[in-house]
Every structure is written in structure tokens, then in C-alpha cells.
Amino acid sequence: MAMASLARRKAYFLTRNISNSPTDAFRFSFSLTRGFASSGSDDNDVVIIGGGPGGYVAAIKAAQLGLKTTCIEKRGALGGTCLNVGCIPSKALLHSSHMYHEAKHVFANHGVKVSSVEVDLPAMLAQKDTAVKNLTRGVEGLFKKNKVNYVKGYGKFLSPSEVSVDTIDGENVVVKGKHIIVATGSDVKSLPGITIDEKKIVSSTGALSLTEIPKKLIVIGAGYIGLEMGSVWGRLGSEVTVVEFAADIVPAMDGEIRKQFQRSLEKQKMKFMLKTKVVGVDSSGDGVKLIVEPAEGGEQTTLEADVVLVSAGRTPFTSGLDLEKIGVETDKGGRILVNERFSTNVSGVYAIGDVIPGPMLAHKAEEDGVACVEFIAGKHGHVDYDKVPGVVYTYPEVASVGKTEEQLKKEGVSYNVGKFPFMANSRAKAIDTAEGMVKILADKETDKILGVHIMSPNAGELIHEAVLAINYDASSEDIARVCHAHPTMSEAIKEAAMATYDKPIHM
């Protein structure tokens, strides 16, 4: 790495000035569930409404920075949508369903004979629930360790420095704070004319807890969540049809990778109806009838399924907080408007995560939370939304960071492209997972890496070499000259980097 790059690294860490000073002693005025919540009769330095990834991480970081902190969470369990009914339970089911699929269809190719493979759905769901329970308890343990006050209840603003909380025990308390952070996350976006009952017409929450494997499943929406949940039930035996209004699945994905990805899902018998609009639904019978037509208009078709999953995106959860009472500005979509320091237009009130503009991702919310409380503590905080990775946790996975080829063309940026397929990677061939590729986009003049896109069974783990490289303005040659262990899947990144500025060795 060049000396200039090393200097940038040193400057970066010096300017962050992150402190881990111990917190002040806390005084607890009364006890709620689990015995470590406070009424907040003494002013807090920081009060956080919402205990999801953004909220609980902000709370812990604030306490580590010596700020007296209270976190309010309506669910009664920390972790938000991600931990309770999103990222974590879906990954548990994705893994369990993949294990079943491998045992049924792949083990024999590796000399492992299994006479009978069956799905024990109750046991599979129980494993998922156990994982969630253990992790939520773990976050509570972190709150205790860091002396974060935890109030279980629904909070809404009384003033810019006061939050009224209806606790899960039926009490009402007022929590006061010098700085209040809104971290209430997002909720499922509904579609006109479709009522989610979480039985036959389900959201992602209901799709995580189906008590029977549907023979036919229709997924409305070809985004991350819809494709992941469609994959779970497809592996377990459901006939899956994905209905999408747009012309492509996961529209924000790099086009070349997306085409490969769709072909892979189609090989897994997932069907796609793109450029298709849902115009009606009938769930009065035993199953569900979905009426669709071409997005541009035309002849209607009726689709039948046992279960319909509505996965048409998410909307910020900002209603019911009495934001208008204190004058906090939101946009037309209900997102809270903030500046680069996460401050709203109301002094002392901040917002992070899914309730503000930007990608609705748990890890982005976590970074927001850390940066926000660093600003509050008088330190340097920073989140670069152009360098936040995204992962689709199907099989294979797709992971990306930075710009797509389509974005660079639109912006008029001259770039080089380097690609390397996993079919030429020795580790991938040895373990029979050679599907996919690594694609690197770099500035044509400077060789600075602008985007990296990976399709591979473990793309979500591989992408972080690229995330680090992009955050430190590395070039493709920088990656190419780093020794990678052999044989590993990560060698494909090195080879793609070599292909970007020169030529790969193994192609």
C-alpha cells in the first residue's frame, strides 16, 4: 500500500478519537420487568426510543462514552424487527432449509448416503425461536453490563426533552433526557386492497412461523426479503411464484450479476412474473386467489396459492410518536429529516436507522447509532452510505458494495471491469460450489475501486475484503498484490482484481 494510503489510515483513527471511558453511577428510582429499568426522574444524557439494531447499539455506545442512557422498547424484547422477526430468524430458517435440501439432493454426490430425509417443521421453528431468545437475552445482558437503563413500553413525545411511556406492566412513566434519539425502525408496507391476516396472506413475520409447508406460495415483491423467504419454503417443497411490478428482480443490483442470480433461482424452480401488477385478491375460500395483469395493463390472470407473502418493501415507523406535537419535520414518506449529525429540526432530538432516508439495513442503523452518539458526546462520527454493503442471503448469496456498472454509466464515469468466475477457483471446484463470480469496477485513470459484486454461496462473508478496500480508497492493484491463502474462495477476489488492472493468472 502506498505511503499516502497509510497516512490516510493514521489520520482516520486519530480524528475519530473514540473513547471507552467508564459510565457514571446510576440511580434507579423504581424497577420494571427484569429489574434494571428507570423511570427517568433524574435527567438522562441520552434517551433512545426503540431497541432495535440502531437503538440498542446507540444505547450501549452512549453508555461506553460516559453518558447516562435510557432505552425504551415497546416489544418487551430487544433487537427490533431484525432480531425478533427479521434478519436473525430468517437466517436460521435459510440455514435449516438449506441443510434439508443438501441432505435430500446433494449428499449422495459426495458419497454420503441418507436413506430417508424428512422435514420436522415444529423442530425447525423451535430452533429458530431458541436462537432468537438467546440473542435477545444476550442484548439485555449487554445493557446490564454497560449500565443502560431499559424501559419496556411504548414511548411518545411530551416535549423535546420528555417521553411518556406506557409500560408493558400497565404503568405510565415520564423519561427525561437532554438528547432524545428516535430509533423506531420500520414496518411492513401494505398494498391497497390486500389485508394481511398472517394466516393465508402473510407478511415476512407470518412467513417465519407458518405451521405447515404450503403446496403453493406466491410472493409479491422480488426484493431481498421476498427472495429469501421464497427460497426457504421452496427448499422445503413449496411451488414458489414471485410476482414483481418492476422489470427486474432486486432492481438496485448490478445488472450482469442480477441476470446470473435470476437464472440460478429459476434452476431451483422459482418462477417469476415480472412487469406484473396485482389488482385483486380473494381469500374467502380454502386458499387465496390473486388477480394480476401486465404492469402496462392488459388481460387479467388469476393465480391460486395456499399462502400469499406480501413483501413489497417497508415503511418508516414514525406514526404514534407525537412527532408533530414537538414540530419534527418528516418527508412525504414519513421519514424523519436529519442533517449530517443526525439532528432533526428540533434541538436535542435526533433520528437514526430506518426512520431516516437511506438504505433500510440493520448494519446501516448500527453505524448510524454509533455516529449519532459520538456527535452527541462531542466526538467525530461518520457513515458513508455509498460504502454500505448489501447481501441477499439466498443460495447462492449475492453481496455488493459501492457502485453498479449501470450507475457508473449513468454518472459518466470511465471505468475498468475485472471478473473472475468461481468455476476457475480451486476451492470452489473441490467442494462443488462453483456457481457465481466476482466482479470489480475501478476508475479507469486512478484504478480506485468503485464497486464490487459477488455471487457465491458465501458472498456475504467474502464481500468485507472489498468493503474495507473501498473505505480506504484502495486500488484493484492493492488487492491483487495482497497474498491470499490457497485454496480459498477469497482468491477469486484477488484474481478479479488482477483482471481489473492487468490479467488474472487462472483464466
UniProtKB/Swiss-Prot annotation:
The active site is at residue 486. It is found in: Mitochondrion matrix. Keywords: Disulfide bond, FAD, Flavoprotein, Mitochondrion, NAD, Oxidoreductase, Redox-active center, Transit peptide. Its main location: mitochondrion. It catalyses: N(6)-[(R)-dihydrolipoyl]-L-lysyl-[protein] + NAD(+) = N(6)-[(R)-lipoyl]-L-lysyl-[protein] + NADH + H(+). The keyword Lyase does not apply. NAD(+) binds at residues 221-228, 244, 278, 313. Its cofactor is FAD. FAD binds at residues 73-82, 91, 155, 184-186, 354, 360-363. PROSITE patterns: PYRIDINE_REDOX_1. Residues 1-36 form a transit peptide. Disruption phenotype: No visible phenotype, probably due to redundancy with LPD1. Its EC number is 1.8.1.4. Disulfide bonds join 82-87. Lipoamide dehydrogenase is a component of the glycine decarboxylase (GDC) or glycine cleavage system as well as of the alpha-ketoacid dehydrogenase complexes. LPD1 is probably the protein most often associated with the glycine decarboxylase complex while LPD2 is probably incorporated into alpha-ketoacid dehydrogenase complexes. The active site is a redox-active disulfide bond. Homodimer. Part of both the glycine cleavage system composed of four proteins: P, T, L and H and of the pyruvate dehydrogenase complex containing multiple copies of three enzymatic components: pyruvate dehydrogenase (E1), dihydrolipoamide acetyltransferase (E2) and lipoamide dehydrogenase (E3). Belongs to the class-I pyridine nucleotide-disulfide oxidoreductase family. This is Dihydrolipoyl dehydrogenase 2, mitochondrial. It comes from Arabidopsis thaliana.
